[in-house]
A protein has these predicted regions:
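A structural motif
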Residues: 754-784
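Beta-strand/loop nucleic-acid-binding surfaces
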Residues: 122-132
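Extracytoplasmic
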Residues: 44-46, 58, 64, 102, ...
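Active-site loop architecture of trypsin-fold serine endopeptidases
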Residues: 151-162, 166, 255-258
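Cell-wall glycan-active module
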Residues: 1-36, 42, 115-116, 166-744, ...
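Glycine-rich, acidic and aromatic/proline-enriched surface loops and short helix-turn segments
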Residues: 69, 74-75, 104-114, 621, ...
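Active-site rim elements
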Residues: 48, 239, 787-795, 848
Length: 886
C-alpha cells in the first residue's frame, strides 16, 4: 500500500488547532475540527487541515492514494463583494463567522496491505474552493499525489479543508484483523506483517545478566586413556554433556567439520599415543592444549548436572538467571535507519524503558550467521519478526530444549536491563499490522441511536473513567416522577453532566487528543440531508423540559435559528448525491482519525500489484526499458516473461515477501533496489545471465589461448567496452587472458567441469559461481550446488527474489566510509543516505562491481522514487513517461 498526506510540503500537515477558535457548526469546533468529538460532545468524523503555503501559494489538495472518483462537486462561487446583512442571511453558505466552501471530492481506494489482504476505504475532502476537474465522473481514475482541488474557506477562514477516512465493518476487519475489542488472538497475522514488531512475554520468564546463548566456558578435555574405552571424551560425548552439537563446538574453536578427524585426536592425546613408536615422538598435550571452548549451559539443563559431577562443580559451566519477569511485558522491536530500539511496555501500554542496538538492523545478517549457524535464514527471521514467517525451518543444531532461542537485552525499567528469551514458551508475536490495543487502538461502537450527539459510554469511560462509587447514567425523570420524589435520580443526572463537562475539557488537551486519534468510531455521517432532524433536533431542547442526559449545555435553538442551521447544512450535504453516483457505503460507518490512519499505513511496506506495475515506466530511454505498455508491465510482475529472457511468475508476491524479510521498509530503500534490478534484469525480463555454453565457460571456467585469439579477432569492441582489453595487443591478450579466467574460476569455486554454465549469474541480483551458490545455500540450509538445484535461483520466483535480498543484506562494502560511500555490511547503509545521483552511484558499485549502466540506473531511480515516495512531481526527462493503467 502506498499512501501520503493530502498535503506534501510538510511531513504532517497542520491541523487548525487553536483552542480559542471554538465556534458552533454541525457538531464541530470550527477551525479545530477535533476528532472524534467536538462542540457539545457531538460526533465529528474528520479533522480540519490548513493548506501549507499561506494565501500567496497554498499547496493543492492531493489524493492520498490511488483510487477512483465516487463523487465530485465544484464549490458554489464565493461572492467577491462584501455581502450585506440581508445577503448573508439569504445565502446558506454564509454562516456564523463567514463563508464556507462546499466543494467536495470522494475517492474510493482499493489496495493491498498484505498477501491476499485487499481492503477498500474512502477518503473525503470537504470545503474545497475548486475541484481539479469539473467534468469528473464516477469511476475516473486518480493516482496518489494527483491534485484534486484547492482548499477553501471554513466559516471565514481560508485555505482549509475537512478531511475524513471511512470504511465499512468488513473492510475494517480486513484492515485491522478485527472490528471490535482488543487484540486477543494467540499470534499476529502472518500474511499481513509490517511496521514495528511486538512480542508479549509472560510473567515468570528467566532473566539473565548476560546473553546465555553466546556465553562460552573453558573445558579441559580428559586425556586419552586406551584402557577405559568408550568412557574417553569424544567430540560427540562432550557435545552431549554440554547439551550442544559437535558442529557448534567445532565452530567455537575455529575448526571445520573436515578438520574434526585430525583436530580432536590431537586435543585428547590419542594421536600422540598412536605415534609413540615414531622416530620423533610428539609430546603429550598439556592441560592448556586440551582446553577447548564449549557453550555455557542454561535453562533446565543448568539445574541437572551429569551423574559424575556435583551441582557445585557443574555450576562453573552454567549461566544462572538473575530473576524472572514479575508481570506480562510487551517488547517492541523498532528499526529506523539501521538502528534497532527495543521498547518495553506493560500490558496497559505504559512505557517502562528502552534499549538501543546501534546498527543492529544493518548487522542482522552477521548476527544471524553467528547465532544460528545451522540455518541463519530462519534465525534472521526470528531476530526481525520474533517468529519465523518463511519456509526455512530452524536447524536442529540451533534449537535449545526444542525451541529456537531469541535472546535480546530489554529494559525492565528506566535503569535496569536484562537478557530475556523472546521466543520462550508462552510468548506471542504481533506487528503494527495487528493494530494492538496497547498502542491505543480502540473501537467505539456502542452509540446506536443514530443522532450526531456522542452518547457513547465507551468513549466517556476512556476520557473520564467513572469512579468506583459513581452511579451509571440515569434515565432522566418526567414531571410525574419528580412529583413522586426522584431527587436522587436528578442528582445522578447532575453528576453525569459534570462528568461530561470534565470529559469535554479533557478532550481539548493535546495528550487526550493524541489518545483519541487511535479510536476507530462507528458514527453516522454528518453529510446526509434526509436525517438532519433525527441527528440535530436535540439542539432545540429547553432547559427544564425533560433534558437529555448527554446534552452538555442546552442550546435551546429557536425555530428561526434552527431552520437557518438546517439550510446551511443542506448546502454542504452531499451524501444522497454520492449514493446516486454509486456510493455503496451505509450512512453509519467507521471513521478513522485520518492523519493517524495515514501515519499508521505509511508503515505498510507491502505494495499492491498495481503499485508495482507502475514502477516500470511506460517509456524510458532505450537502454533502460524503452516502451512498456501497462499490460506488459502487469504481466512481467504477475505472469512473468518468456520472450527475450525468462522471468518467473508471481514476482509481485515474491518481492513483497523478500522486502519484508530483509528490511526494505521505506520507499527509498525499495526505489534503490528496483532501480538496480531493473537494469540488472533488462527492465524485469530476465533472472539469468544471458549467454551460450561457450560464453559462460570462457567467462567463468576456462579459456584456451585459441579461444582468446578468436575473441580478440571477433569481439574486440565488446572486450574494450567491458574493460577486458585494457590496451593490450593481441599476443599479450592471448598470453594473459586464459590465466585471468583460471584465477577467476578458482575465486568463484568453479573447480568442476561445467561449473561455468552451471553457476552462471542467476537471481534478480546475480549470484555467480559455485562458492556464491554454496554460501547462499548455507544461509538457508538448502543445497543449491547439486543439479538441478542451481536453476532454482532463476526459475523459482521466491528464490530469485530471496537471493537478491540475501545479496543486499550480506554485502560487505569497503570504502573510506564518508559521504555516500559508507562502508560495512548491508547496502541499506548507502540506500538510507539519500536520493541523489551520487547515492545511486554508490549503490551501483557493490551491486554491479563497477558502474555499468549507471545512467540507466539513475534514470530508473528518479522515476521509481517519484512513484513510491512523496516526491511531488515526475522527473524532468523527455525520455520518461509515467505508467498508468489502461
Amino acid at each position: 500500500m502506498l499512501i501520503s498526506f493530502p498535503f506534501l510540503r510538510t511531513p504532517e500537515p497542520r491541523t487548525d488547532d487553536a483552542l480559542n477558535q471554538g465556534t458552533f457548526g454541525l457538531g464541530e469546533r470550527t477551525g479545530k475540527g477535533a476528532f472524534p468529538v467536538s462542540h457539545q460532545f457531538g460526533w465529528h468524523g474528520g479533522v480540519h487541515l490548513v493548506a501549507p503555503g499561506g494565501d500567496a501559494n497554498p499547496e493543492p489538495v492531493r489524493a492520498i492514494a490511488d483510487g477512483e472518483i465516487v463523487y465530485a462537486r465544484p464549490s458554489t462561487p464565493k461572492p467577491k463583494a462584501t455581502p450585506t446583512g440581508e445577503e448573508r442571511d439569504a445565502n446558506p453558505l454564509y454562516y456564523y463567522a463567514g463563508w464556507t466552501s462546499n466543494g467536495v471530492v470522494i475517492l474510493k481506494h482499493r489496495t493491498e496491505i498484505g498477501e491476499g489482504v485487499e481492503v477498500v476505504f474512502y477518503s473525503i475532502y470537504q470545503h474545497l474552493s475548486t475541484v481539479a476537474k469539473a467534468d469528473w465522473k464516477s469511476g475516473d481514475k486518480v493516482y496518489r499525489k494527483d491534485p484534486i482541488g484547492k482548499a477553501g474557506d471554513i466559516y471565514g477562514k481560508s485555505n482549509r479543508i475537512h478531511f475524513e477516512i471511512v470504511a465499512d465493518k468488513a473492510n475494517v476487519e480486513r484492515l485491522m484483523g478485527r472490528s471490535e475489542g482488543k487484540l486477543e488472538v494467540a499470534e499476529g497475522r502472518r500474511n499481513c506483517v509490517w511496521g514495528d514488531m511486538h512480542i508479549v512475554v509472560p510473567a515468570g520468564v528467566p532473566l539473565y545478566a548476560v546473553n546465555p546463548r553466546t556465553e562460552t566456558r573453558k573445558y579441559v578435555v580428559r586425556a586419552f586413556n586406551s584402557t577405559v574405552g568408550v568412557t574417553n571424551d569424544t567430540l560427540e560425548s562432550v557435545a552431549q554433556r554440554f547439551h550442544t552439537t559437535p558442529a557448534r563446538i567445532l565452530a567455537l574453536n575455529g575448526k571445520t567439520a573436515a578438520q574434526a578427524g585430525t583436530w580432536w585426536p590431537k586435543v585428547t592425546g590419542a594421536y600422540q599415543i598412536a605415534m609413540a613408536s615414531a622416530t620423533k615422538r610428539p609430546p603429550v598435550p598439556t592441560d592448556a592444549q586440551r582446553t577447548i571452548r564449549v557453550p555455557a549451559v542454561y535453562g533446565a539443563a543448568a539445574a541437572m548436572p551429569p551423574d559424575d559431577l556435583t551441582a557445585e562443580v557443574w555450576a562453573q559451566w552454567t549461566v544462572q538467571p538473575i530473576g524472572r519477569t514479575r508481570e506480562v511485558l510487551i517488547v517492541t522491536l523498532s528499526e529506523a535507519r539501521g538502528d534497532i530500539t527495543l521498547i518495553t511496555r506493560d500490558v496497559a501500554g505504559e512505557r517502562r524503558g528502552n534499549v538501543s542496538e546501534p546498527q543492529g538492523g544493518y548487522n542482522l545478517y552477521k548476527t544471524a550467521v553467528d547465532t544460528y549457524p545451522g540455518c541463519p535464514s530462519a534465525g534472521y527471521e526470528m531476530l526481525r519478526f520474533g517468529r519465523i514467517l518463511g519456509p526455512d525451518a530452524p536447524a536442529a543444531t540451533d534449537l535449545h530444549e526444542g525451541r529456537l532461542p531469541h535472546f535480546r537485552k530489554i529494559a525492565l525499567d528506566g535503569s535496569t536491563t536484562a537478557f530475556v528469551d523472546l521466543n520462550c514458551a508462552g510468548t506471542k508475536a504481533y506487528s503494527d499490522a495487528d493494530f494492538p490495543h496497547w498502542q491505543g487502538w480502540t473501537f467505539i461502537d456502542d452509540d446506536t441511536d443514530g443522532n450526531s450527539r456522542c452518547d457513547s459510554m465507551q468513549l466517556l469511560d476512556l476520557i473520564e473513567p467513572r469512579s468506583p462509587t459513581q452511579p451509571p447514567v440515569p434515565d432522566l425523570p418526567g414531571s410525574s416522577e419528580v412529583a413522586q420524589g426522584a431527587a436522587t435520580v436528578i442528582d445522578a443526572a447532575t453528576q453525569h453532566r459534570g462528568r461530561l463537562i470534565r470529559a469535554y475539557a479533557k478532550a481539548q488537551r493535546g495528550e487526550m487528543r493524541e489518545r483519541l486519534s487511535y479510536c476507530v468510531v462507528k458514527m453516522p455521517s454528518e453529510w446526509a440531508r434526509d436525517d438532519f432532524d433525527k441527528r440535530w433536533d436535540w439542539l432545540k431542547g429547553v432547559e427544564g423540559q425533560s433534558p437529555v442526559a448527554n446534552i452538555l449545555f442546552p442550546i435551546c435553538l429557536g425555530d428561526a435559528a434552527y431552520e437557518r442551521l438546517k439550510r446551511h447544512h443542506q448546502a454542504l450535504a452531499f451524501w444522497e448525491d454520492a449514493v446516486e453516483n454509486g456510493l455503496t457505503l451505509d450512512k453509519e460507518h467507521y471513521h478513522f482519525h485520518p492523519m493517524r490512519f495515514v501515519d499508521a499505513l505509511k508503515c505498510c511496506s507491502w505494495r499492491s500489484t498495481r503499485e508495482l506495475a507502475q514502477t516500470l515506466p511506460r517509456r524510458s530511454s532505450q537502454n533502460a526499458g524503452g516502451a512498456i505498455p501497462w499490460s506488459v508491465a502487469w504481466d512481467r510482475w504477475t505472469r512473468g516473461n518468456s520472450g527475450d529472457g525468462f522471468m518467473p511468475q508471481n514476482m509481485h508476491i515474491a518481492i513483497n515477501r523478500m522486502w519484508l524479510k530483509y528490511g526494505f521498509i521505506t520507499p527509498l530503500r525499495q526505489a534503490h533496489f528496483l532501480a538496480q534490478i531493473y537494469k540488472e534484469s533488462g527492465a524485469f525480463k530476465s533472472t539469468a545471465e544471458k549467454g551460450d555454453e561457450r560464453y559462460l565457460r570462457t567467462m567463468y571456467e576456462a579459456l584456451t589461448p585459441i579461444e582468446a585469439g578468436e575473441d580478440y579477432d571477433n569481439k574486440r569492441a565488446w572486450l574494450q567496452a567491458m574493460g577486458f582489453l585494457r590496451g593490450r595487443d593481441r599476443p599479450t591478450y592471448v598470453l594473459q587472458r586464459p590465466g585471468e579466467i583460471r584465477e577467476k574460476a578458482q575465486s568463484l569455486g568453479n573447480v568442476q567441469l561445467g561449473d561455468g554454465p552451471r553457476f552462471r549469474g542467476r537471481g534478480l541480483i546475480h549470484l555467480t559461481g559455485r562458492n556464491g551458490y554454496k554460501i547462499y545455500g548455507e544461509f538457508r540450509n538448502v543445497d543449491y550446488t547439486t543439479d538441478p538445484s542451481p536453476s532454482r535461483l532463476s526459475i523459482d520466483s521466491s528464490v530469485a527474489a530471496d537471493s537478491a535480498g540475501y545479496f543486499w543484506a550480506s554485502k560487505v562494502m569497503v570504502s573510506p566510509n564518508a559521504g555516500a560511500l559508507r562502508s560495512g555490511m548491508n547496502i541499506h547503509r548507502r540506500a538510507d543516505l539519500g536520493a541523489a545521483d551520487i547515492n545511486v552511484s554508490a549503490i551501483t558499485t557493490p551491486v554491479n562491481g563497477g558502474s555499468t549502466g549507471l545512467q540507466e540506473r539513475q534514470e530508473f531511480f528518479k522515476y521509481i522514487h517519484f512513484i513510491l515516495d512523496d516526491v511531488e512531481s515526475m522527473p524532468l526527462s523527455s525520455a520518461l513517461k509515467r505508467q498508468v493503467e489502461d
